[in-house]
Amino acid sequence: MATAEKKQPSVIVILGPTASGKSALALAVAKKIGGEIISADSRQIYREFDIGAAKPSESALGEIRHHFVNEKNIGEPFTAGDFATEAAERIITLHRRGKRAVVAGGSTLYLEGLIEGFADLPPANPEIRARLLGELEEEGNEKLYAKLFERDPDQAATLDPTKSQRLIRSLEIIEITGLSVTELQARAKKRQHGDLCFVTTGLAMERATLYQRINHRTDNMIDAGLYDEAKGLYHKYHKLIASGKVSSLQSVGYQEFFQYLDGMISFDDAVRLIKQHTRNYAKRQLTFFHNRLSVNWTDAPLNSKELDSLAERLSKGP
């Protein structure tokens, strides 16, 4: 007699803006359920991004298995699509071993790809892309960003206006398909990963508190040696940095110190900009999560008692 296929256990997802306490909560939950952590962070996957990527401590990594941490070399391609596919495979493998997964991170496209799946987007069109790049060179990011904001404000709100790669791609998709990225993603609404059930919790806090935490964490990173880490990367990967082709080397916390090392800004300005750019990034993360994902928001724990209480609640969820 055939037995019914066993239902997959739910996957706990913990998301939120940077500095909201996701990693600590994920570790606490994983300990309670005997699970493993799937890191949804596009920088933590790379070796050598340590302090600037706010990687878990060596003790945390030794205590609970963290997937997608220290698995790639800088410059090695790894897309959101790669993450979505590989993360789903690892979660299913964990389930077969009788273990559960805790997904934690703030990389918006990693999370969307895993939880919702991606819309089928068209391949690049060389002619359209060349024309848009020409417009970018002549008119600058600001005008192209305004053009995107008029056509797809939800997508525009999730982008850094100073970065051109996703801006150009978003406009290219509109010209090729006649539809915006937001419209295509809304049409997709499909699960790509079989019977996986994601229970998504978002960590919320007052904006002033979040910004204070960001500023404090930046100061702690500086004290821990972030500048020396950035300086080492600057000298080792100078050609890659200058090429602008490796997006991870353009990320917050590193690019500002690279500008200082290039003699473009002062050290104090670099620190100030890291804080400012991190706050801007947190705002874009929140916009994305509210616009593109279905999230159960809860107050972020601000002390050890609140952390343990929330971890206990999540561990006993569906």
From Swiss-Prot:
Necessary cofactors: Mg(2+)
Described purpose of this protein according to its UniProt entry: Catalyzes the transfer of a dimethylallyl group onto the adenine at position 37 in tRNAs that read codons beginning with uridine, leading to the formation of N6-(dimethylallyl)adenosine (i(6)A).
Residues with site note (Interaction with substrate tRNA): 107, 129
Residues reported to bind ATP: 16-23
Pfam families: IPPT
Reaction equations catalysed: adenosine(37) in tRNA + dimethylallyl diphosphate = N(6)-dimethylallyladenosine(37) in tRNA + diphosphate
EC number: 2.5.1.75
Keywords in alphabetical order: ATP-binding, Magnesium, Nucleotide-binding, Transferase, tRNA processing
Subunit relationships: Monomer.
Ranges where the record places region Interaction with substrate tRNA: 41-44, 165-169
InterPro entries: Dimethylallyltransferase, IPT, P-loop_NTPase
Family listed: Belongs to the IPP transferase family.
A biological-process GO annotation: tRNA modification
Protein name: tRNA dimethylallyltransferase
Protein's organism: Pelodictyon phaeoclathratiforme (strain DSM 5477 / BU-1)
